[in-house]
């Protein structure tokens, strides 16, 4: 696959979405927001931060063979596998990332 490093990772944390309950579903429709996906993003961020705090590396994968994962782990059809968070000890140091400056991505009191 696209992420050959994942084959050697000792831990895969799958994030599986369940259908929201009635109240959450209606709230999401009214507000035009997908609250379960927001919650999943928050949880994934905290998982990776916790891994880093323990000296582990992590990688959040959204592109994987969901059908194969679902079959392998007997995940019901009514649930969606949203993310695979791979956790393990890094074999290489983290490469320096090219990032935009703070001024390019942060604004105060206006967009």
Residue ranges: model-predicted function:
Residues 55:
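Structured binding elements
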Residues 47:
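Aromatic/hydrophobic pocket-lining residues that form π-stacking "cages" and hydrophobic walls in ligand
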Residues 1-40:
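Glycine/small-residue-rich phosphate/adenosyl-binding loop
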Residues 68-82:
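Short, electropositive alpha-helical surface patch
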């Amino acid at each position: 696959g696209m992420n050959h490093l994942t084959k050697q990772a000792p831990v895969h944390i799958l994030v599986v979405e369940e259908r929201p309950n009635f109240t959450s579903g209606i709230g999401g429709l009214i507000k035009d927001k997908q609250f379960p996906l927001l919650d999943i993003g928050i949880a994934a961020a905290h998982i990776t931060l916790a891994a880093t705090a323990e000296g582990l590396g992590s990688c959040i994968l959204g592109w994987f063979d969901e059908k194969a994962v679902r079959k392998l782990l007997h995940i019901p059809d009514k649930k969606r596998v949203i993310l695979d968070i791979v956790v393990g000890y890094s074999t290489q140091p983290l490469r320096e990332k090219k990032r935009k400056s703070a001024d390019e991505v942060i604004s105060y009191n206006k967009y």
